[in-house]
Amino acid sequence: VDNKSMKNLTFEKYGLSPEKVEQLRAYKILPDKQTLKNLIKAYETDKAEETEIADFQRELSQPIDEKYIRFLLEHNGGIPSKNRVKGSKVVIDRFLAFRSAYRFHSLIDLYPDFQKQGIPIARTPAGDTLLLAEDQQIYLFNHNIQDIEPNPIATSFANLLMKLY
Protein backbone atom coordinates (compact mmCIF):
# COMPACT_ATOMS: atom_id res chain seq x y z
CA VAL A 1 0.00 0.00 0.00
CA ASP A 2 1.68 3.19 -1.09
CA ASN A 3 2.65 5.59 1.64
CA LYS A 4 0.47 8.41 0.42
CA SER A 5 -2.73 6.52 1.12
CA MET A 6 -1.27 5.37 4.44
CA LYS A 7 -0.25 8.81 5.64
CA ASN A 8 -0.89 9.09 9.37
CA LEU A 9 -2.81 5.83 9.26
CA THR A 10 -1.80 3.28 11.86
CA PHE A 11 -3.26 -0.07 12.85
CA GLU A 12 -3.46 -1.17 16.44
CA LYS A 13 -3.54 -4.88 17.13
CA TYR A 14 -7.08 -6.04 17.84
CA GLY A 15 -7.75 -7.78 21.14
CA LEU A 16 -6.38 -7.54 24.67
CA SER A 17 -2.73 -7.87 25.63
CA PRO A 18 -1.85 -9.43 29.02
CA GLU A 19 -0.92 -5.92 30.27
CA LYS A 20 -4.25 -4.52 29.16
CA VAL A 21 -6.12 -7.38 30.87
CA GLU A 22 -4.30 -6.59 34.13
CA GLN A 23 -5.17 -2.92 33.73
CA LEU A 24 -8.85 -3.64 33.18
CA ARG A 25 -8.82 -6.06 36.11
CA ALA A 26 -7.32 -3.35 38.34
CA TYR A 27 -10.05 -0.92 37.29
CA LYS A 28 -12.67 -3.68 37.63
CA ILE A 29 -13.91 -3.08 34.08
CA LEU A 30 -13.36 -6.49 32.53
CA PRO A 31 -15.85 -7.55 29.85
CA ASP A 32 -17.85 -10.77 30.36
CA LYS A 33 -15.85 -14.02 30.42
CA GLN A 34 -16.64 -15.09 26.85
CA THR A 35 -15.78 -11.69 25.37
CA LEU A 36 -12.62 -11.56 27.44
CA LYS A 37 -11.56 -15.00 26.20
CA ASN A 38 -12.22 -13.97 22.59
CA LEU A 39 -10.29 -10.71 22.90
CA ILE A 40 -7.31 -12.50 24.46
CA LYS A 41 -7.41 -15.07 21.63
CA ALA A 42 -7.60 -12.29 19.05
CA TYR A 43 -4.56 -10.58 20.55
CA GLU A 44 -2.55 -13.81 20.25
CA THR A 45 -3.07 -13.84 16.47
CA ASP A 46 0.21 -14.50 14.66
CA LYS A 47 1.44 -12.79 11.52
CA ALA A 48 -0.02 -14.02 8.23
CA GLU A 49 2.30 -16.20 6.14
CA GLU A 50 2.72 -15.66 2.41
CA THR A 51 2.28 -19.39 1.82
CA GLU A 52 -1.13 -19.59 3.53
CA ILE A 53 -2.38 -16.54 1.63
CA ALA A 54 -1.14 -18.11 -1.63
CA ASP A 55 -2.96 -21.37 -0.77
CA PHE A 56 -6.15 -19.43 -0.09
CA GLN A 57 -5.76 -17.50 -3.34
CA ARG A 58 -5.52 -20.81 -5.26
CA GLU A 59 -8.83 -21.99 -3.75
CA LEU A 60 -10.56 -18.75 -4.71
CA SER A 61 -12.45 -18.09 -7.87
CA GLN A 62 -11.27 -14.48 -7.72
CA PRO A 63 -7.93 -12.69 -7.58
CA ILE A 64 -6.97 -10.89 -4.37
CA ASP A 65 -5.93 -7.25 -4.60
CA GLU A 66 -2.10 -7.11 -4.32
CA LYS A 67 -2.29 -4.12 -2.00
CA TYR A 68 -4.61 -6.02 0.29
CA ILE A 69 -2.22 -8.99 0.40
CA ARG A 70 0.61 -6.62 1.32
CA PHE A 71 -1.58 -5.12 4.04
CA LEU A 72 -2.28 -8.59 5.48
CA LEU A 73 1.42 -9.47 5.49
CA GLU A 74 2.38 -6.17 7.06
CA HIS A 75 -0.43 -5.58 9.55
CA ASN A 76 -2.66 -8.66 9.47
CA GLY A 77 -5.72 -6.58 10.25
CA GLY A 78 -6.19 -4.32 13.23
CA ILE A 79 -7.98 -1.22 14.43
CA PRO A 80 -7.37 1.73 12.09
CA SER A 81 -6.46 5.09 13.64
CA LYS A 82 -8.99 6.67 11.27
CA ASN A 83 -12.19 4.69 11.06
CA ARG A 84 -14.80 6.65 9.10
CA VAL A 85 -15.18 6.14 5.37
CA LYS A 86 -15.60 9.39 3.43
CA GLY A 87 -18.79 9.55 1.37
CA SER A 88 -20.59 6.83 3.33
CA LYS A 89 -22.03 6.20 6.78
CA VAL A 90 -19.62 3.32 7.27
CA VAL A 91 -17.42 3.17 10.35
CA ILE A 92 -14.77 0.45 10.59
CA ASP A 93 -14.46 -1.32 13.91
CA ARG A 94 -11.49 -3.41 12.76
CA PHE A 95 -9.82 -4.97 9.76
CA LEU A 96 -9.86 -8.76 9.99
CA ALA A 97 -6.75 -10.84 10.45
CA PHE A 98 -6.08 -13.52 7.82
CA ARG A 99 -6.37 -16.21 10.49
CA SER A 100 -7.21 -15.88 14.17
CA ALA A 101 -8.21 -18.18 17.03
CA TYR A 102 -11.17 -15.81 17.49
CA ARG A 103 -13.52 -16.74 14.63
CA PHE A 104 -15.02 -13.27 14.24
CA HIS A 105 -11.59 -11.79 13.64
CA SER A 106 -10.56 -14.47 11.15
CA LEU A 107 -11.00 -13.87 7.40
CA ILE A 108 -10.41 -17.54 6.65
CA ASP A 109 -13.17 -18.64 9.05
CA LEU A 110 -15.70 -16.00 7.98
CA TYR A 111 -15.11 -16.42 4.24
CA PRO A 112 -17.45 -19.45 3.83
CA ASP A 113 -20.35 -17.26 5.03
CA PHE A 114 -19.93 -14.91 2.07
CA GLN A 115 -18.19 -16.97 -0.65
CA LYS A 116 -20.05 -15.80 -3.72
CA GLN A 117 -20.08 -12.19 -2.60
CA GLY A 118 -16.45 -11.62 -1.75
CA ILE A 119 -13.72 -11.82 0.85
CA PRO A 120 -14.54 -10.38 4.28
CA ILE A 121 -11.90 -7.75 5.11
CA ALA A 122 -13.38 -5.64 7.91
CA ARG A 123 -16.25 -5.40 10.40
CA THR A 124 -18.34 -2.45 11.53
CA PRO A 125 -19.49 -1.83 15.13
CA ALA A 126 -23.02 -2.65 13.91
CA GLY A 127 -21.96 -6.15 12.85
CA ASP A 128 -21.87 -5.49 9.10
CA THR A 129 -18.96 -6.75 7.01
CA LEU A 130 -16.88 -5.06 4.32
CA LEU A 131 -16.23 -7.40 1.40
CA LEU A 132 -13.57 -7.28 -1.29
CA ALA A 133 -15.61 -8.43 -4.29
CA GLU A 134 -14.53 -10.15 -7.48
CA ASP A 135 -14.50 -6.77 -9.28
CA GLN A 136 -11.93 -5.69 -6.62
CA GLN A 137 -14.32 -3.04 -5.26
CA ILE A 138 -15.32 -2.89 -1.60
CA TYR A 139 -18.98 -3.48 -0.72
CA LEU A 140 -20.89 -3.47 2.55
CA PHE A 141 -22.69 -6.68 3.50
CA ASN A 142 -25.59 -5.49 5.62
CA HIS A 143 -26.42 -8.13 8.23
CA ASN A 144 -29.97 -6.80 8.66
CA ILE A 145 -30.93 -7.56 5.08
CA GLN A 146 -28.39 -10.42 4.76
CA ASP A 147 -27.23 -8.95 1.48
CA ILE A 148 -24.75 -6.64 -0.15
CA GLU A 149 -25.66 -2.99 -0.54
CA PRO A 150 -25.57 -2.24 -4.29
CA ASN A 151 -23.16 0.70 -4.32
CA PRO A 152 -19.50 0.06 -3.59
CA ILE A 153 -17.99 1.95 -0.63
CA ALA A 154 -14.63 2.12 -2.40
CA THR A 155 -13.27 1.24 -5.84
CA SER A 156 -10.32 -0.74 -4.42
CA PHE A 157 -8.59 -1.57 -1.16
CA ALA A 158 -6.14 1.33 -1.60
CA ASN A 159 -9.08 3.64 -2.32
CA LEU A 160 -10.76 2.48 0.91
CA LEU A 161 -7.66 3.36 2.95
CA MET A 162 -7.47 6.72 1.21
CA LYS A 163 -11.08 7.46 2.14
CA LEU A 164 -10.53 6.87 5.86
CA TYR A 165 -10.69 9.96 8.04
PLM regions: where:
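Short, surface-exposed beta-strand/loop "edge" segments at domain boundaries and coil↔beta transitions
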Residues: 127-131, 145-152
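Short acidic-glycine loop/turn motifs at beta-strand connectors
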Residues: 132-136
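Compact, glycine/acidic-enriched structural inserts
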Residues: 147-165
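Catalytic Cys-His active-site segments of thiol-dependent hydrolases/isopeptidases
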Residues: 139-144
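A surface-exposed partner-binding patch
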Residues: 2-129
